[in-house]
Amino acid sequence: MKGGLGNIMKQAQKMQEDMQKAQEEIAAMEVSGEAGAGMVKVTMTGRNEVRKVEIDPSLFEDDREMVEDLVAAAVNDAVQKVQRESQERMSGMAEGMGLPPGMKLPF
């Protein structure tokens, strides 16, 4: 019984370390979202911090409302990519821990 508890504690500690590492990797990653066939690009971190906005110069000849809509769409695209990447990394970790498919980790 004593050895079993020690094993459980070691597994819990490793799981905590793995989760922290995955969260750090997610925070450090960068993704780019696009809209308007790539005419507007937004780069953001895994923490949803926008790092860069690129707008094709030809868009400035068009109306402002369209540019604003494309920027919003590119930001939303980048946010979705961060969420998708985070879910993929965390579900991979859950499978490595022997959790059933579809079981979500507590975050």
Swiss-Prot record:
Region annotation Disordered: where it falls in the sequence: 1-24, 82-107
GO CC term (a single one): cytosol
Name this protein carries in UniProt: Nucleoid-associated protein Hhal_0231
Biased composition (Basic and acidic residues): 15-24
Entry keyword annotation includes Translocase: no
Family membership: Belongs to the YbaB/EbfC family.
GO molecular function: DNA binding
Keywords: Cytoplasm, DNA-binding
Function: Binds to DNA and alters its conformation. May be involved in regulation of gene expression, nucleoid organization and DNA protection.
